[in-house]
Amino acid sequence: MAHKKAGGSSRNGRDSESKRLGVKKFGGEAVIPGNIIVRQRGTKWHAGANVGLGKDHTIFALTTGNVDFRKKANGRVYVSVMPKAEAAE
């Protein structure tokens, strides 16, 4: 009787797709309106000046400028966009 014993089925082998969270534009980098600066769950980073906060807590640029990360006395890190100085006309 040349039979093989039935192989057991594994209960593992599943994983969720990564969400690609984190900082997308770092301090000092140039951004234009609409650029995503941080993708996050909750507010690990808080919205500062010239940035918007999406419903999924994504921080994005509202103006052209450079990204600035600042830690305040309350311990929170605020992300802002420092506008570029307009050329004198």
Swiss-Prot record:
- This chain belongs to the protein called Large ribosomal subunit protein bL27
Output the InterPro entries linked to this UniProt entry. Answer: Ribosomal_bL27, Ribosomal_bL27_CS
What family does the entry list? Belongs to the bacterial ribosomal protein bL27 family.
Biological process per Gene Ontology, one example term: translation
Region of interest: Disordered = 1-23
Pfam annotation, one family:
Ribosomal_L27
Q: Which NCBIfam families match?
A: L27
Provide GO CC annotations from the record: cytosolic large ribosomal subunit
Q: What are the recorded GO MF terms, alphabetically?
A: structural constituent of ribosome
The UniProt keywords, alphabetically, are: Ribonucleoprotein, Ribosomal protein
Lineage, top-rank taxon, reads Bacteria
Organism of provenance: Rhizobium meliloti (strain 1021)
